[in-house]
């Protein structure tokens, strides 16, 4: 298995969830596992646009990341190619349902061996990312 899929029901519209992708300040609040923060250096939210950022871990470690927005289809899809190690593509699809939306997060690694070796990290990290996104967009204090 070289791909991991998670989904989360969120009590918000697909448009509101999509806005959390297109705004680098908002994206930095939820992208990454629990305890991580993001500093964006370059953010070009368009197909082929670059997103260069640094993840700051809870222990003080920093992780530079280089990505490219492969596909953007407002308000239902964002595909992001991660060109730093490990190499993968994340495709987020957002579907409106009664009472909110479902986001499906599909992370496909280039290497099956790499995916197997880090599955114990990736699976919970993806759930934490979606939990952070849900908390942000469902917050009555956060205006999107």
Question: Predicted segment positions?
Answer:
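Short, surface-exposed coil-to-beta transition loops
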Residues: 3-5, 38, 62-66, 87-91
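Hydrophobic ligand-binding cavity/cleft-lining segments
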Residues: 1-37, 42
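Beta-strand/loop substructures that line and gate deep hydrophobic ligand-binding cavities in soluble
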Residues: 79-128, 144
């Amino acid at each position: 298995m070289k791909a991991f899929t998670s989904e989360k029901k969120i009590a918000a519209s697909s448009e509101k969830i999509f806005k959390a992708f297109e705004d680098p300040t908002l994206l930095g609040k939820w992208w990454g596992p629990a305890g991580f923060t993001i500093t964006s250096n370059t953010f070009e939210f368009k197909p082929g646009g670059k997103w260069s950022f640094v993840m700051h871990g809870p222990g003080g470690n920093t992780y530079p990341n280089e990505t490219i927005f492969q596909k953007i289809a407002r308000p239902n899809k964002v595909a992001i190619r991660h060109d730093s190690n490990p190499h993968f593509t994340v495709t987020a699809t957002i579907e409106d349902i009664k009472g909110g939306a479902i986001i499906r997060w599909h992370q496909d690694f280039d290497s099956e061996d790499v995916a197997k070796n880090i599955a114990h990290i990736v699976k919970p990290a993806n759930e934490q990312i979606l939990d952070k996104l849900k908390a942000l967009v469902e917050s009555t204090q956060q205006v999107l």
